């Protein structure tokens, strides 16, 4: 994780700039990596329990797995090892974020390694999170398709904020530009 060279990172008015990942998580921030971390030796249910901070029942674990498009009975007792594909690991990681129920959920290119059918399911997961969330969802993506579910879009180019505003204001200009492939951060929920 890079340390910022200037500025602050605030979460609910609290400066979290120099806090560890664990300290940030304890304040209600979750992060799903572009390349999911492999927790070898753990079962999927155990990982979901760790994420939730409590012993998750099989029914709860199955609910989280079903929400991300995995057949729960095939995964709940499965070990996290090299037999899982990148897309499966990505979905399990998103299920972990759902289990945590945090104030701010950050997803770094959640569509990476996921096929088109799963991508549509992923969009539905984010829409459901948006409807049920008490916090905010931040999605970092290069995919135009994911921008359609954003409330707010922030376009970052060469490390600087280039454009920021409501989807209705930013998306038409972004899609019409030659730089439509620029990275964009989409804030879905800001409650």
Each model region followed by its residue ranges:
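Q-loop/switch helix immediately C-terminal to the Walker
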Residues: 35, 41-60
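Walker B catalytic motif
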Residues: 106-110, 117
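Conserved H-loop
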Residues: 142-148
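Helical segment within the ABC ATPase nucleotide-binding domain
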Residues: 119-132
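ABC ATPase C-loop
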Residues: 97-98
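Hydrophobic anchor residue at the start of the ABC signature
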Residues: 93-94
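ABC ATPase NBD Q-loop/coupling interface
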Residues: 8-24, 81
């Amino acid at each position: 994780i890079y340390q910022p060279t200037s500025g602050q990172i605030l979460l609910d008015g609290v400066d979290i700039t120099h806090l560890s990942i664990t300290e940030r998580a304890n304040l209600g921030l979750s992060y799903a990596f572009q390349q999911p971390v492999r927790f070898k030796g753990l079962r999927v249910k155990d990982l979901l329990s760790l994420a939730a901070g409590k012993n998750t029942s099989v029914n709860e674990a199955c609910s989280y797995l079903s929400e991300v498009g995995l057949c729960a009975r095939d995964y709940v007792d499965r070990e996290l090892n090299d037999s899982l594909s990148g897309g499966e690991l990505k979905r399990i990681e998103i299920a972990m974020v759902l289990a945590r129920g945090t104030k701010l959920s950050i997803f770094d290119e959640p569509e990476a390694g996921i096929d088109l059918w799963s991508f549509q399911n992923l969009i539905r997961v984010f829409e459901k999170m948006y409807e049920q969330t008490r916090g905010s969802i931040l999605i970092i993506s290069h995919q135009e398709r994911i921008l359609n579910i954003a409330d707010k879009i922030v376009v970052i180019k060469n490390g600087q904020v280039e454009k920021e505003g409501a989807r209705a204001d930013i998306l038409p200009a972004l899609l019409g530009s030659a730089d439509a492939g620029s990275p964009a951060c989409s804030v879905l929920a800001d409650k």
